[in-house]
């Protein structure tokens, strides 16, 4: 577990939350699911990811440091729910009805698919694109896909194709 820049108090708070929610789930489900492996290796704008086959949760240390309380309250149970759903139901839609049920009825946490953390410190170079209603910032990866003709992106609000400025 690479955790060199994270204060021990934050790491302990993450483990407390993980263990608390896992115990709650095991009690409500009548199971004894094991504690998942935890690492602080997630990069980019994702707060965390759940790796099903390796039964591992990867958390973003930068976003954790910048948003400790909300991160621990929301992201840790969010990723744990993915692992529990996989153990309990098998392969299902990532944020489907089983995940929502696990979040709300078992873990007692609002089922939100995305975080609302400020991303300036973790966002790499972006490229400005426009539609008819607003400006968008595309990541290097998405920009390169557009340049190579491999992808077309549309605005989720107006539906218009995004065009480089």
UniProtKB/Swiss-Prot annotation:
UniProt GO MF annotations: zinc ion binding
Cofactor: how and how many bound: Binds 1 zinc ion.
Superkingdom assignment: Bacteria
Gene3D superfamilies noted in UniProt: Metalloproteases ('zincins'), catalytic domain
Compartment(s): Cytoplasm
This protein's GO CC annotations: cytoplasm
UniProt cofactor(s): Zn(2+)
Keywords from the UniProt entry: Cytoplasm, Metal-binding, Zinc
Family: Belongs to the SprT family.
NCBIfam families: PRK04860.1
Record function comment: Involved in bolA gene expression at the stationary phase.
Protein name: Protein SprT
Protein species of origin: Escherichia coli (strain K12)
Gene name of the encoded protein: sprT
């Amino acid at each position: 577990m690479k955790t060199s820049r994270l204060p021990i108090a934050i790491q302990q708070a993450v483990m407390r939350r993980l263990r608390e929610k896992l115990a709650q789930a095991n009690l409500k489900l009548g199971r004894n699911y094991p504690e998942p492996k935890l690492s602080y290796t997630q990069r980019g704008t994702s707060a965390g990811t759940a790796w099903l086959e390796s039964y591992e949760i990867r958390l973003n240390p930068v976003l954790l440091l910048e948003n400790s309380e909300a991160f621990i309250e929301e992201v840790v149970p969010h990723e744990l729910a993915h692992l529990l759903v996989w153990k309990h139901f098998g392969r299902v839609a990532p944020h489907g009805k089983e995940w929502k049920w696990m979040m709300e009825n078992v873990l007692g946490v609002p089922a939100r698919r995305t975080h609302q953390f400020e991303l300036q410190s973790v966002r790499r170079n972006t490229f400005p694109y426009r539609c008819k209603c607003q400006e968008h910032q595309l990541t290097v990866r998405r920009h390169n896909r557009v340049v190579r003709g491999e992808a077309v992106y549309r605005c989720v609000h107006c539906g218009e194709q995004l065009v480089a400025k």
